[in-house]
């Protein structure tokens, strides 16, 4: 067969030449197809000029043109949408050979680099803000110690404790804890702290609120306590709101004043619970362990001299390194205490009614019957708690005549207390410029702040802050008498009663946290302006600032550090816990640890310390440069003096030479 016989005629289509593509499909991202050997060079040139990259999904779903169309219209094929479609590209990822599979690599194209560079540059421009307290995001749980913890699990074994631990109150609290923020605002009461000024004049504020809002404030050392009766009424004389009228008692005192007096006279016993608590620790079951140890000690008693150390098994139970616990009240003790408070209130009402004139005898008889009912039932409680003989235990004889009356009166007073928690709202005003609201709505809070801000009293607020500089701390709270342990979880405070002394203790820690937030916001712009200086010093070797400018910046940081550690009361324990209620200090510490005040202060001091050290280096370098400049000035002055001396000598020589020549 000759060579001419193998050549195709002009009208025939050229046959495809056999070709083996020895390429790596993983690295050929935009590999073009070559359906015909003779057309490969032209299509490659057109593809390089076009510079078009097609996606893999289009290649797998579209159908390519026929070979005849590709041959007759090569330009249309190179510039069309499906010019890069071939069987090789479609099946490039469906190969059994590992080397033929497409490798996924990170994009290194120039189009992706500017975006990454923009992200990095934007991150470098902004300094990392101060880390917020983790209890806002990590759902931190802190068990608040309280003396009203019912220890009804005390006679149960550990297994029974585990089975009976879930309760209705705790389940309700857990459901509230996991609600979103907008649901909490609608269903739960608010605790909000506002830092609106550098300080308050509490004496002037006492008079202002008493005259305009018709309330009876009380001053506790460095805090002003104000109780409002809900619903609030419109104010008079241009003021926005005022307190509602509280229920009057027979002695002329309001119900809220009696509740406040009762809370102040109540004994509070708290202890801080640290570390990981077991079920026994949570319920304070130390009497069982003590009784068991006493029984074992009675069985095997050995006398140890005083000068010898105690054996390991007979060491004293007191260990100062372990948390100490107060004995919790039993249900009967709680009931007795509440009844005693009711007795005192009823006695006070009876004395006031006897002293006042115009009261009917029917009211006196009713009050006396209530009082006798309370006293009779209280004697029954004492007799039931006192150890007695088996005969007396088997035949108890409660005062049946007064039992029903007492239950009715006691239930009425207890319901009134529970409803009174919802009918009252409270404000705690601290002398360092923080106001803490309890059980107010947001509109009511802003109305009270507006009345205080625009008051006509002089020096009521010391250096008030601008609206954009006001710091807030927001929590939610609820009252639940059935809860096992008062606690705070996910910024929700669960308490058993509306004792304002407990709320005052928690408000101290919340107010200090709000004041610390103000310091954190003050340091942010200072650090942003200072962060550029180390980079400039590393690039150019100079700061471009004078000594006075460096001293001003370092002075701002040092002033902030002094305000945090010395001037403010963030690190100090309030005087209230030293003079009024020392037993409330563990509760204050628990709330303070939840708000992470000590950790935040440490972070603030560390950041200030780093930049102050940098400023010290910069000031030393500037001082060294100034000393070098002064040294050069001295050298120039000495040179000038030498030149002047030489000039004087030369002039003298010339003058003397002229005189001698003449």
Curated annotation (Swiss-Prot):
Its main location: membrane. Pfam families: DUF155 (PF02582). One of its GO terms (biological process) is meiotic cell cycle. Residues 383-395 have a biased composition (Low complexity). Residues 286-304 have a biased composition (Polar residues). Residues 1-136, 286-320, 346-406 are annotated as: Disordered. One of its GO terms (cellular component) is membrane. Residues 99-121 have a biased composition (Basic and acidic residues). Required for sporulation. This is Sporulation protein RMD8. It comes from Saccharomyces cerevisiae (strain ATCC 204508 / S288c) (Baker's yeast).
């Amino acid at each position: 067969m000759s060579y001419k016989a193998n050549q195709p005629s002009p009208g025939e289509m050229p046959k495809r030449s056999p070709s083996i593509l020895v390429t790596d499909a993983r690295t050929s991202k935009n590999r073009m197809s070559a359906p015909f050997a003779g057309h490969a060079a032209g299509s490659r040139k057109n593809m390089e000029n076009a510079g078009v990259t097609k996606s893999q999904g289009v290649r797998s779903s579209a159908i390519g043109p026929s070979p005849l169309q590709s041959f007759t219209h090569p330009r249309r094929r190179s510039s069309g949408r499906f010019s890069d479609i071939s069987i090789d590209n479609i099946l490039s990822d469906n190969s059994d050979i590992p080397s033929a599979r497409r490798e996924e690599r990170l994009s290194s194209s120039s189009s992706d680099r500017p975006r990454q560079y923009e992200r990095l540059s934007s991150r470098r421009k902004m300094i990392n803000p101060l880390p917020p307290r983790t209890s806002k995001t990590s759902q931190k749980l802190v068990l608040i110690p309280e003396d009203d913890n019912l220890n009804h699990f005390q006679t149960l074994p550990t297994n029974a404790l585990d089975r009976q631990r879930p309760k209705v109150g705790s389940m309700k609290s857990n459901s509230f804890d996991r609600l979103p923020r907008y649901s909490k605002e609608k269903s739960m009461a608010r605790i909000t702290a506002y830092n609106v000024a550098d300080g308050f004049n509490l004496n002037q504020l006492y008079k202002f609120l008493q005259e305009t809002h018709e309330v009876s404030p009380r001053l506790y050392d460095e805090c002003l306590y104000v109780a409002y009766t809900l619903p609030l009424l419109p104010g008079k004389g241009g003021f926005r709101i005022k307190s509602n009228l509280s229920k009057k008692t027979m002695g002329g005192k309001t119900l809220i004043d009696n509740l406040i007096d009762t809370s102040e006279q109540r004994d509070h016993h708290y202890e801080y619970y640290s570390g990981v608590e077991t079920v026994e620790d949570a319920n304070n079951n130390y009497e069982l362990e003590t009784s068991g140890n006493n029984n074992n000690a009675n069985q095997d008693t050995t006398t140890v001299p005083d000068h010898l150390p105690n054996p390991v098994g007979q060491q004293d139970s007191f260990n100062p390194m372990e948390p100490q616990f107060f004995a919790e009240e039993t249900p009967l003790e709680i009931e007795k205490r509440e009844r005693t408070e009711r007795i005192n209130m009823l006695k006070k009402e009876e004395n006031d009614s006897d002293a006042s004139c115009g009261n009917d005898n029917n009211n006196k008889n009713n009050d006396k019957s209530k009082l006798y009912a309370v006293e009779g039932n209280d004697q029954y409680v004492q007799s039931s708690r006192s150890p007695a003989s088996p005969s007396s235990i088997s035949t108890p004889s409660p005062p049946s005549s007064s039992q029903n009356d007492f239950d009715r009166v006691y239930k009425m007073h207890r319901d009134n207390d529970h409803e009174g928690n919802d009918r009252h709202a409270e404000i705690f005003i601290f002398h360092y410029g923080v106001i803490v609201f309890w059980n107010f709505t947001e509109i009511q809070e802003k109305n009270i702040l507006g009345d205080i801000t625009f008051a006509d009293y002089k020096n009521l607020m010391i250096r008030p802050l601008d609206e954009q500089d006001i710091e807030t701390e927001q929590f939610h709270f609820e009252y639940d008498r059935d809860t096992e342990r008062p606690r705070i979880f996910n910024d929700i405070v669960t308490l058993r009663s509306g004792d304002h002394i407990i709320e005052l203790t928690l408000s101290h820690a919340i107010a200090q946290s709000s004041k610390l937030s103000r310091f954190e916001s003050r340091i942010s712009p200072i650090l942003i302006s200072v962060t550029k200086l180390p980079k400039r010093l590393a690039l150019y070797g100079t700061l471009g600032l004078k000594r006075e400018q460096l001293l001003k910046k370092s002075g701002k940081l040092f002033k902030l550090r002094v305000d945090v550690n010395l001037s403010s009361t963030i690190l100090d324990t309030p005087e209230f816990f030293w003079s009024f209620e020392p037993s409330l200090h563990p509760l204050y510490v628990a709330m303070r640890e939840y708000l992470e005040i000590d950790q935040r202060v440490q972070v603030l001091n560390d950041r200030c310390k780093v930049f102050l050290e940098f400023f010290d280096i910069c000031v030393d370098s500037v001082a060294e440069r100034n000393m070098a400049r002064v040294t050069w000035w001295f050298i120039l002055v000495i040179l000038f003096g030498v030149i002047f001396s030489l000039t004087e000598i030369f002039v003298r020589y010339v003058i003397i030479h002229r005189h001698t020549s003449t």
